[in-house]
Amino acid sequence: MNHFPKLLSSQIGFDVAQTMLENFDRHYRIFREAAVDAKTLYERADWHGLQRLARERITSYDDRVQECVEVLQDEYDAENIDDEVWQQIKLHYIGLLTSHRQPECAETFFNSVCCKILHRSYFSNDFIFVRPAISTEYLENDEPAAKPTYRAYYPGTDGLAATLERIVTNFQLEPPFEDLTRDIGCVMQAITDEFGEFDAAPNFQIHVLSSLFFRNKSAYIVGRIINADRVLPFAVPIRHVRPGLLALDTLLLRRDLLQIIFSFSHSYFLVDMGVPSAYVEFLCTIMPGKPKAEIYTSVGLQKQGKNLFYRDLLHHLSHSSDRFIIAPGIKGLVMLVFTLPSFPYVFKIIKDHFPPPKETTREQIMEKYQLVKRHDRLGRMADTLEYSSVALPISRLDHALVRELEKEVPSLLEYEDGNLVIKHLYIERRMIPLNLYLQNGTDAEIEHGVKEYGNAVKELMKANIFPGDMLYKNFGVTRHGRVVFYDYDEIEYLTDCNVRRVPPPRNEEDELSGEPWYTVGPHDIFPETYGPFLLGDPRVRAVFMKHHADFFEASLWQASKDKLLQGELPDFFPYDVSLRFSVRYPDRFDATPDAGDGDSAGNAQRAA
């Protein structure tokens, strides 16, 4: 039954709707400006500036929502607007969105503002956008000066090499390329290596998204090759190979490699999108099966991703019958974790009380999760979705889980109309806990898991992250085989840690003591003491010492800390370095002039 009013008679309703949309438009303008600034910072190789920009953009959305709430409270006394007017506000807002190019994001912004003003009893489709109201299908920016979402190129006309060069140069990057002809040759060789010689069909074409995707020290060209009935995804990372010179680093042609680049364990891209839904639709065609929620999140629209995820959860609950259960594995001291077996995510709640030796607070743990959200995750830390007032049907909760919730988090629970409302929780992708992966794995799987674990921790330390609790149970294995850290309550910046060696025992009593004979400060770390916790299984020990014997040396950790303190930002690659053109085709690079060679300027080609 439709409860909406027949007439839109409220001027306040229209004014509030218009004010909310104006505030959203301001938010999205700032969002796009960040992507434009990212291109400038990338061209200057200002990596610290790019990091700062990415951090600031993450908090920008909440700032704009709060500004809008304050305006509505000050100018319209929003909390006291009656129900009929609130319904009209939504209808007016829908009317204002009919020609909008980011309607789905504007609807989410509307929800965010309303959730700050209205009681949760109003969280229905009468008052907020539980379901989308405006279609985003075939949405494009048709203004004459606007860039299309993607450009189509036809190699049959000019040849593949010339087409590839035009694709790169159309992005008009300011620094010249070290040797673009060489790089295009590498791209063509990689295509041949992957597919062999293939016959060009009449519809042979290449589609390329019109904006670059910026993250870390790379700018990615993302597109698809169409040939007959085949759709082949690709991404080309562009990197600074030496001061003032660019190069195409590799060509990623496999769908699984693109899915890793757009993974939940990586930081969000900075990408300028006039019509974000069109970008997401394009990305869905090259990564079928990847949820739209994750794609929206990966391109920096994490609130839209969060909104879509919640809709996916509600949809799944209405089309499934299994129960939420306590997550398998070792129970944590700080978090209560549960899952729905038919849904590939885990739900994490901060407990009301923590047993010794944990010395922390709810506020400190929430700040750790925010630290991870703001930090460069490098594909090694799981992203989290943070929710308030999540209502789950009591009938879908296992009895053991309900007892555990009532025991561990009573302050966060409310019973309401057959639902259990959880006041605060985090949601993450479900992974195989690394301790179980190693415990049950074959020799090959153990070697892979241990090698990945060491690589993950080493990459995190280079990114200024000390995990705190190094146990395998705090790491997970993704469906792509990547080892990812997901327990953040003890996380610290490595630069805040004091890396120490264990001093030699003073006497035999010290040597036999089960307690440290030396003082340990709150930020002291002793890498050589990690062995007993990580190397108990002989099979694990053998491969750990084969690949990561230096893991337990304080000098490794101190060297990373020293470089960070000197302002160095190391290179990270979300793909195996063996795929880099310089590694894959070394003969093509042997003749490249050195940066100091007088011929280098002649070989440099400007992408303009």
UniProtKB/Swiss-Prot annotation:
Catalytic residues of the enzyme: D383
**Alphabetical UniProt keywords:** ATP-binding, Cytoplasm, Glyoxylate bypass, Hydrolase, Kinase, Nucleotide-binding, Protein phosphatase, Serine/threonine-protein kinase, Transferase, Tricarboxylic acid cycle
Which GO terms of the molecular function aspect are on file? [isocitrate dehydrogenase (NADP+)] kinase activity; AMP binding; ATP binding; phosphoprotein phosphatase activity; protein serine/threonine kinase activity
Where do the annotations place ATP binding?
A327, P328, G329, I330, K331, G332, L333, K348
> Where found, per UniProt?
Cytoplasm
> Any keyword Iron?
no
User: In terms of domain of life, where is this protein from?
Assistant: Bacteria
Name the InterPro entries for this protein: AceK_kinase (IPR046855), AceK_regulatory (IPR046854), Isocitrate_DH_AceK (IPR010452)
- The Enzyme Commission number assigned here is 2.7.11.5, 3.1.3.-
Q: Which GO terms describe its cellular component?
A: cytoplasm
What biological processes does GO assign it?
glucose metabolic process; glyoxylate cycle; tricarboxylic acid cycle
Record field: catalytic activity: L-seryl-[isocitrate dehydrogenase] + ATP = O-phospho-L-seryl-[isocitrate dehydrogenase] + ADP + H(+)
**Task of the protein:** Bifunctional enzyme which can phosphorylate or dephosphorylate isocitrate dehydrogenase (IDH) on a specific serine residue. This is a regulatory mechanism which enables bacteria to bypass the Krebs cycle via the glyoxylate shunt in response to the source of carbon. When bacteria are grown on glucose, IDH is fully active and unphosphorylated, but when grown on acetate or ethanol, the activity of IDH declines drastically concomitant with its phosphorylation.
Q: Which family does it belong to?
A: Belongs to the AceK family.
Record's protein name: Isocitrate dehydrogenase kinase/phosphatase
Record the organism: Burkholderia ambifaria (strain ATCC BAA-244 / DSM 16087 / CCUG 44356 / LMG 19182 / AMMD) (Burkholderia cepacia (strain AMMD))
- Provide the organism lineage as a comma list: Bacteria, Pseudomonadati, Pseudomonadota, Betaproteobacteria, Burkholderiales
